[in-house]
């Protein structure tokens, strides 16, 4: 696929996940493009709304599954527009872009997925890829959300709380705002659900730090505390991966909108990332 070209895709399903997020399922009009389109978990695409504008968004589905899916939060002019679109409408897709998570490198190891809020979307791609492939030792998912109503992919999360161990997946959930639904969920899964922040979910957990990788995505304020917890447990900076989705525009490193760092170490978020290790963050000013 030409990385500079936008390909037409039909919206085949729109699902409301929360009051602010919708899940868009897509299929390319060109059958050859549809069959050959592939990507790595952690990569992103540029959504092109013809005659209106474009924006970057992570793929939240797994490369092992169809259709391709995008989880889009309604926050600005472009996302408000696409939230008004319906099944059958056509949008443009170009990409995929970015480096993605090094899934091959991590085969045979434990995966510790740590998501906060909307950060669950790109990590969902990793989650189902890891489950489907069966190439990883154990999968942990620690997910922090504001409330029950804000849980992304709620049905999937509850299914994994119930049956995740059968899929070699250990899931824990933290919520901040106490509601009747959260209390009910906590009663049903007292060892897996609690009121608090995502780092509270580490209590009682032990990891083989020599055979584990941590993958983090969430609001910027979360990274500091999660990384500190991981380092305190002995995980090396090179085994801590973060996906940093901010300030991206063109997707190919041409516009310079996402440059961070200094003359000593410059990174393009869209081209060198959006996935970086904590070692990268230590050597590049402004990365986190």
Curated annotation (Swiss-Prot):
It is found in: Cytoplasm. It is an enzyme of class 1 (oxidoreductase). InterPro entries: Cbr1-like_FAD-bd_dom (IPR008333), Cyt_c3_hydrogenase_gsu (IPR012165), Dihydroorotate_DH_ele_sf (IPR037117), Dihydroorotate_DH_Fe-S-bd (IPR019480), FAD-bd_FR_type (IPR017927), Flavoprot_Pyr_Nucl_cyt_Rdtase (IPR001709), FNR_nucleotide-bd (IPR039261), OxRdtase_FAD/NAD-bd (IPR001433). Its EC number is 1.12.98.4. It catalyses: n sulfur + H2 = (n-1) sulfur + hydrogen sulfide + H(+). Binds 1 FAD per subunit. Binds 1 [2Fe-2S] cluster. GO terms for molecular function: 2 iron, 2 sulfur cluster binding; flavin adenine dinucleotide binding; metal ion binding; sulfur reductase activity. The keyword Iron applies. Its cofactor is FAD; [2Fe-2S] cluster. Residues 4-103 form the FAD-binding FR-type domain. [2Fe-2S] cluster binds at residues 250, 255, 258, 270. Optimum temperature is greater than 90 degrees Celsius. Activity increases with increasing temperature from 30 degrees Celsius to 90 degrees Celsius. Has a half-life of 6 hours at 95 degrees Celsius. GO terms for cellular component: cytoplasm. Keywords: 2Fe-2S, Cytoplasm, Electron transport, FAD, Flavoprotein, Iron, Iron-sulfur, Metal-binding, Oxidoreductase, Transport. CDD domains: sulfite_reductase_like. GO terms for biological process: pyrimidine nucleotide biosynthetic process. Part of a bifunctional enzyme complex that functions as a hydrogen-evolving hydrogenase with sulfur-reducing activity. May play a role in hydrogen cycling during fermentative growth. Activity exhibited with NAD in addition to NADPH. The beta and gamma subunits form the sulfur-reducing component that catalyzes the cytoplasmic production of hydrogen sulfide in the presence of elemental sulfur. Dimer of heterotetramer of alpha, beta, gamma and delta subunits. The nickel-containing alpha and delta subunits constitute the hydrogenase activity. The beta and gamma subunits (flavin-containing dimer) constitute the sulfur reductase activity. This is Sulfhydrogenase 2 subunit gamma. It comes from Pyrococcus furiosus (strain ATCC 43587 / DSM 3638 / JCM 8422 / Vc1).
């Amino acid at each position: 696929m030409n990385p500079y070209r936008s390909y037409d895709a039909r919206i085949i399903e729109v699902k409301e996940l929360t009051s602010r997020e919708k899940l868009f399922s897509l299929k390319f009009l060109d059958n050859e493009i549809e069959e050959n389109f592939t990507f790595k978990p952690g990569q992103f695409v540029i959504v092109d709304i013809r005659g209106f504008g474009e924006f970057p968004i992570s793929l939240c589905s797994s490369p092992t599954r169809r259709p391709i899916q995008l989880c889009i939060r309604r926050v600005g002019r472009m996302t408000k527009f696409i939230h008004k679109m319906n099944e059958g409408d056509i949008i443009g897709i170009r990409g995929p872009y970015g480096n993605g998570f090094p899934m091959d490198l991590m085969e045979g190891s434990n995966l510790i997925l740590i998501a906060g809020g909307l950060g669950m979307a790109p990590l969902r791609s990793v989650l189902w890829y890891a489950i489907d492939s069966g190439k990883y030792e154990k999968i942990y998912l620690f997910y922090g959300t504001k409330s029950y109503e804000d849980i992304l992919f709620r049905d999937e999360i509850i299914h994994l709380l119930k049956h995740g161990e059968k899929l070699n997946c250990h899931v824990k959930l933290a919520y901040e705002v106490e509601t009747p639904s959260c209390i009910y969920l906590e009663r049903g899964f007292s060892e897996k659900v609690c009121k608090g922040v995502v780092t509270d979910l580490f209590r009682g957990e032990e990891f083989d730090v020599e055979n584990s990788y941590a993958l983090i995505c969430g609001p910027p304020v979360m990274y500091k505390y999660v990384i500190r917890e991981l380092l305190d447990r002995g995980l090396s900076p090179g085994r801590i991966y973060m996906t940093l989705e901010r300030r991206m525009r063109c997707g190919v490193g041409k516009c310079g909108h996402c440059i961070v760092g200094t003359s000593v170490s410059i990174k393009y978020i869209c081209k060198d990332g959006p996935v970086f290790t904590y070692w990268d963050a230590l050597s590049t000013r402004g990365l986190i």
